[in-house]
Amino acid sequence: MDMKFLDVLLPMMFEGLKLTVLIAVVGIGIGFLIGSLCGYLLQSKYKVGKAIAEVYIWIIRATPLMVQALYGYFVIPKLVSVDISSTIVGIGVIALNSGAFISEIVKGALMGIDPGQKEAGASLGLTSSQTMLHLIIPPAFKSALPALFNQFITSVKDTALLSAIAVNEITHQAQAYAALSFKAIPTYTALAVFYLIILSILIIVQKQIERKMR
């Protein structure tokens, strides 16, 4: 097989990688904030907040990410009469999706904390917020870290679906090259290998984190 096509395709995919990482990092960052709030509400006594979090999670988990992207790109801008770039829509979709799954991670991490931590905080004269900040959140975050990193890996993979709304991430760049060069087989083979390498690196990093936390 003539490998000269990689001279053009690889730079395109690396250019797409920049946007993929940007969308995944910003999306998971916003998703972490959303997920942390919803995760707290899910195990709290605030019935209204808990209900809102449950409805949000239900909607996100019961609809495909690609459908959400299409709705966000083609429908929402018309409803609000504002132009929204595909990149912003992509970040929003990744944020909302990761937030829904992170909320369950956070809920599990908080519920896994020894109830005695709250009693310890009270005995030390700490307020509820101080107890949460100093005695509950640190161990909860530590226990949730492997699952959070796994969600980041999932978000990186999910960015490939954003090619449906013309986000110039890795997959969209490969699709553009395949359409122009008529080299579908080598192009998509290279794309698969490219993702395999990138995600394998992230999986190795995740395993290292898990090993250090044992």
Predicted features, each with a name:
Residues 1-214:
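Transmembrane alpha-helices and adjacent helix-loop boundaries
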